[in-house]
Regions:
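Bergerat-fold GHKL/Histidine-kinase-like ATPase
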Residues: 1-31, 35-46, 51-52, 58, ...
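Intrinsically disordered, low-complexity regulatory tails
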Residues: 56-147
Length: 358
């Protein structure tokens, strides 16, 4: 059986932890859980954990992976890594046939030694857990990613020194926006659906005190009504001869977190942001991209895909005139490429839903 002190030990660690059910603890023989009356599914265990008097019980994430060996099923309980540490009891726990666990004590694994049930982990180990909670155990670039995830605590300021996003809990973290004068495209596929199609490019500097930790490009869309990071470019192969490029963002990346920070500026219109998101693909992971590409290539022939990406004369004329109004250098070739990309984006977005269900 899984005990409460074991849960504490496994939560107060630096990585995912695993408990295997269906293997004898002493002989290591595979006995299986096929007929085990104590077997629990993921939903049952999650519900049980949320009822315990644990400081972060609602933050605990688990999953169960079942494997079959010699026709015997074993369950692998994965307790996923969390930064909501140290974990401790909020109320005394007194099991009928085991040692009582006092509230407030912190159990952890120190090397190969478990914290005794009537004691707390040593100071050095508790300090490491608090460093994990505050992300100070990470390098500065990884720390930056975590403060960006706290996007509601950033605020925008513009003064004679420039334009900045500042992190309220720790102003040593701040973002500086700089006008970019390089000769770049003035119109992109994801700006065509804006009321104003021209782009104002920005150099984004992620700074910590006087140091620049990272840089990337961003742009104001719709005459400054929306600020977004420059999306990534990916390729889709129709066949061995033809490849089409399109723009996307990946969740759980620095650029996606920047998008959330930029979107939190008070007073900005929400519609330009919606139009931008509709013009790119937002993936959970690279694996989702691969699944989506494979699904399209399995469902449609190359000819069918080409037909779905074909730009209508009506769309071509409309967007060409619209873009040329603000950008006289906008060419017929650019327009064809951009509109083909938008058609590909629409196709990809319809298939992402299917991959998430498989």
């Amino acid at each position: 059986m899984l005990s409460l002190d074991q849960i504490h030990l496994l939560l107060n660690t630096p990585e995912d932890c695993y408990i295997i059910f269906g293997i004898d603890n002493i002989t290591l023989d595979i006995i299986g859980v096929n007929n085990d009356d104590n077997r629990r599914n993921e939903e049952d265990l999650t519900d049980l954990l949320h009822k315990l008097f644990i400081s972060t019980n609602n933050q605990i994430k688990i999953s169960i992976q079942t494997e079959t060996i010699d026709n015997k099923e074993i369950d692998i309980l994965i307790i996923h890594d969390t930064d909501k540490v140290p974990v401790f009891l909020t109320k005394d726990y007194k099991p009928k046939k085991d040692t009582a666990l006092p509230k407030g004590l912190i159990y952890a694994i120190n090397g190969s030694i478990n914290t005794p049930k009537d004691s707390s982990a040593p100071f050095e180990l508790i300090n490491e857990l608090f460093q994990k909670f505050n992300h100070t155990d990470l390098n500065i670039k990884e720390q930056y990613f975590h403060v960006l995830k706290d996007y509601k605590n950033w605020f925008f300021i513009e003064n004679e020194d420039g334009r900045f996003f500042i992190y309220n809990p720790n102003p040593d973290f701040y973002i500086k926006l700089n006008d970019d004068d390089a000769n770049r495209f003035k119109t992109m596929s994801y700006s065509l659906n804006q009321y104003q199609t021209n782009i104002d490019w920005q150099l984004v500097q992620l700074r910590y005190r006087h140091l620049t930790i990272d840089e990337c490009m961003a742009m104001y869309l719709d005459q400054g009504n929306c600020l977004v990071p420059s999306p990534e470019v990916e390729s889709f192969k129709i066949d061995y001869q033809e490849t089409i490029y399109y723009h996307c963002l990946y969740k759980n990346t620095l650029k996606y977190q920047l998008l959330k920070v930029f979107s939190s500026i008070p007073g900005l219109e929400k519609y330009p942001l919606t139009r931008f998101k509709n013009s790119i693909v937002i993936y959970d992971t690279k694996l989702e991209l691969k699944k989506t590409h494979n699904l399209i290539n399995s469902k449609f022939s190359s000819k069918d895909i080409v037909n779905q990406l074909e730009v209508t004369e009506k769309d071509f004329d409309f967007y060409y005139k619209k873009a040329r109004h603000k950008n006289p250098d906008y060419s017929i070739q650019e327009n064809q490429v951009n509109l083909t990309e938008l058609n590909l984006v629409r196709l990809l977005k319809t298939q992402i839903i299917h991959t998430s269900l498989n």
